[in-house]
Amino acid sequence: MPNPPEYEHLKNQVRILSLNGGGARGLFTISLLAEIERIIEEKQGINGFKVGDYFDLITGTSIGGILALGLAYGKSARELEDVFRKQAGYIFPEQKYPRFFPVFRRRYRLARGPLYDSKPLAKTIASMVGEESTFNDLKCRVLIPTVNLSTGKPQFFKTPHNPEFHRDGRIKLIDAALATSAAPTYFAPHYCVDLDSYFADGGLVANNPSFIGLHEVFRDMATDFPEAKVSDVKILNVGTLGEEYSLSPSSLAGKSGYLGLWGMGERLVLSAMAANQELHKAMLLREFATHDAIGNFVRLDNNIPHEAASDITLDNASASSLSNLASRGRQLATEEFTKNKALADFFKVPARKFK
């Protein structure tokens, strides 16, 4: 089918929205996207604008994967922001530790099981995409990384955008969402009945899924974009205020044994996620630089000020932390949309439908 006139100059261009993992910090991500919707509606005098309509592929990990599925399902970023902000406190309830020995109390809890029950998370996901919806119901191509604990391999849930795909179309969205967000120590592994497998958080392999999104264009999206080159791919990557995680030299030198250094595994998980996030970003930038297309990668994120770092954590869903996250997301959206033409260019023409 020939391209409509407004798409002719974009026939080889591929736009990807990539959403990082980060637990409760995902409110920063979705608040930023929601503010972009508000800005564009105000500037253009329109109603019902949805950021998800402007991308050929949406990829996301952990909370980013949940949000990616919601956007591809047809929800606006503002709808998802409203749901997540209301439910975050139920997903990550405040831990009622005694005044004394809180660290030991937390470790005792972890020794018996994960920190949080997955049921409130499942309920939140269901309110976003339904309990029975499948990948066949999505309006945009999607790529969701997870770790299949039963096979010991990474696994990527996808829409059936490759004619050879026969598996994921029937998979329920809620299963993929729970799989990609099952962060070790925080949530139990997710069991998917349809695949008879257990899954863990996709952040263990690709907390920033931008590079695997680029790879997807030339592998399983090649039927739809047979002439696309690396220089034709544009990626908007939204972070979660959590680019770096490191242990202090004094901690590394002074701690001995697993418990002393890693606690009950939380610091190990966060270190692994932060390191692979930096690795994927570095590989992506190198690939774009090789093709003289470094400007095709637009990254929206902020470093957390030192004094705020202890408050803005993966599982802090206190009212003050959520307000901080939402405010930072809205502020960055306003600043970048005003001065960054490359950001505004993502939203000039809606993406072509893949079905």
Swiss-Prot record:
Annotated InterPro entries: Acyl_Trfase/lysoPLipase (IPR016035), PNPLA_dom (IPR002641)
Disulfide pairings: none
Motif stretch (GXSXG): 60-64
Entry keywords, A to Z: Antiviral defense, Hydrolase, Lipid degradation, Lipid metabolism
Regulation of catalytic or functional activity: Phospholipase activity is specifically activated upon 3',3'-cGAMP (cGAMP) binding. Is not activated by the other cyclic dinucleotides 3',3'-cUAMP, 3',3'-c-diAMP and 3',3'-c-diGMP. Therefore, is specifically activated by only the nucleotide synthesized from its adjacently encoded nucleotidyltransferase (DncV). The cGAMP-activation of lipase is inhibited by T4 phage protein Acb2 (Vs.4).
Highest rank taxon of the organism: Bacteria
GO biological process, one term: lipid catabolic process
Protein name: cGAMP-activated phospholipase
Molecular-function annotations in GO: phospholipase A1 activity
PANTHER family: XYLOSE ISOMERASE (PTHR32176:SF92)
